[in-house]
Amino acid sequence: MAADIGIDLGTASILVYVKGKGVILKEPSVVAFDRDSNEVKAIGEEARLMLGRTPGNIVAIRPLRQGVISDYTVTEKMIKYFVQKALGRRTFKKPRISICVPSGVTEVERKAVEEATYAAGAREVNLIEEPVAAAIGAGIDISKPCGNMIVDIGGGTADIAVISLGGTVVNSSIKIAGDDFDEAIVRYMRKKHN
């Protein structure tokens, strides 16, 4: 039997939901690989622990920047790894995967996420805008004829949307989010406390 999987592919972290089991993985969106051979050395938490601590030929990177794919091949490998880790076994049927994208991404960026997910082994891919997924995850009935404002602040983007009657009425995505907040705090602390 094929699995239904939901993936929140974020700049800072990735969450994997499996139907009937709930959220079973939450790990950093980091991949460590050998620059010389392009061999993946670690993914997720193990790779995050390598950030800034690797020899010259091992590079630990975050393959998404501001909510979009910055390294297609590495993102594909990361998605494949987390899908296999979530399923924990070989399946005869490829899974159906619903994956989140920021509300302001271009058609090219949407296509890149879709293609990377298919290449990672999906049978069917559904792209869902992050504010819609956040509303559903918060238990909001998005089918009602009243507006719900959703503000989803991730690591790379902040998505703001008004959702009503099952769709997005208006939305905006800005590329200022959690990573920028962290950097601003670090700059302030350095300036204030040397």
Task: List the model feature ranges, each with a label.
Residues M1-I153, A161-N194:
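Nucleotide/phosphate-binding catalytic cleft detector across ATP-hydrolyzing
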